[in-house]
Design a protein with these regions (language model features):
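Periplasmic polypeptide-binding modules associated with outer-membrane biogenesis and secretion
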Residues: 1-110, 128, 142-161, 280
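Short coil/turn motifs at beta-sheet boundaries
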Residues: 15, 67, 79-81, 120, ...
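C-terminal transmembrane beta-barrel domains of outer membrane proteins
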Residues: 38-39, 277-289
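Gram-negative/organellar outer-membrane beta-barrel architecture
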Residues: 91-267, 271, 278
């Protein structure tokens, strides 16, 4: 929950106050400037007393919407007739999440038991690891290590603040995936037909990079480029199965992908919004053939 109670009752006769200091507490991991970057008011700013509560409530929502904290309190401390300090107290969430991974290759548990005798060879297992605040700058690292029926070794690192103005960010990711079963075409009833093998029949590796720009609180732009290499077993493109799997007689497909995303967002709570809006535009181009 978020404490919405301000600890000071402001006198009506004060028309305007200057923000002398912003005092932040509770941020054991998160850098102070990451919190200050999200606030709608800064040190040295002048705020009308009639607008102070609304300004602090807005700052509280913006800090909470970083998803770095489970509780945020923002309150004023009157110093004199001209100055006010703003007290920001946060409680950090748990940032490290190792999650076990277990997946059946089949559509249901009953199919796995009845058709494949609950064979462990039909299982994919591993771990997904995420750290949402590695250096205290809201940078995120995700790792996936999966083996078994499917194989997935991938990582992604997001650094949302890479310049002094804290407005630009970058993301880098890469991965290697394999599977022992793929859908190679549909039958006359539009049912998927699958090609299976004890060995891996499809392999894929990719690398992706993106640049994001957030010059204003509400607006974010993201530019992404990625490259993918996909290879299927030669049997998949044989006359028996689907010689035009990639719309060619090749068992390999390489392609680039470019995308641009523009997003405007202003909500009271990014996880459970009750009021506000989010609008986005996505332009994407896959392949240049």
């Amino acid at each position: 929950s978020i404490d919405t109670t301000f600890s000071e009752i402001l006198p009506d006769y004060l028309p305007k106050l200057c923000v002398r200091h912003i005092i932040v507490s509770g941020n054991k991991k998160t850098k102070k400037y990451i919190i200050l970057r999200e606030m709608s008011v800064g040190e040295g700013d002048s705020v009308l007393v009639s607008n102070l509560n609304a300004t602090l409530l807005k700052s509280r929502d913006l800090i909470y919407n970083t998803t770095l904290f489970i509780n945020v309190t923002v309150s004023p401390r009157i110093i004199d007739a001209n100055d006010v300090d703003i007290i920001v107290d946060v409680k950090e969430r748990w940032y490290i999440f190792p999650i076990p991974y277990l997946e059946l290759a089949d559509r249901s548990f009953n199919e796995w038991v009845d058709k494949y005798n609950a064979s462990f060879n039909r299982l994919s297992y591993g771990v997904m690891f995420s750290h949402f605040n590695i250096s205290g700058r809201k940078d995120q690292l995700s790792l996936i290590l999966v083996n078994g029926f499917k194989r997935n070794i991938s990582f992604e690192y997001k650094a949302p603040y890479t310049n002094p103005a804290l407005s630009d960010g970058e993301t880098l990711g890469s991965g290697f995936l394999q599977t022992r079963e793929i859908a190679f075409k549909t039958d006359n009833n539009n049912h998927l037909l699958y090609y299976k093998n004890d060995d891996f029949v499809k392999s894929e590796w990719y690398i992706t990079a993106s640049y994001s720009s957030r010059k204003a609180i509400k607006k974010k732009e993201t530019f992404l480029i990625s490259f993918r290499h996909i290879k299927v077993a030669d049997s998949v493109i044989s006359q028996t199965y689907n010689p035009g799997y990639f719309n060619s007689n090749s068992s390999i497909q390489n392609f680039f992908e470019l995308s641009y995303k523009l997003q405007f967002s202003e909500v009271d709570n990014i996880l459970y919004p009750l009021k506000g809006y989010t609008n986005s535009l996505l332009l994407q181009k896959r392949g240049f053939g």
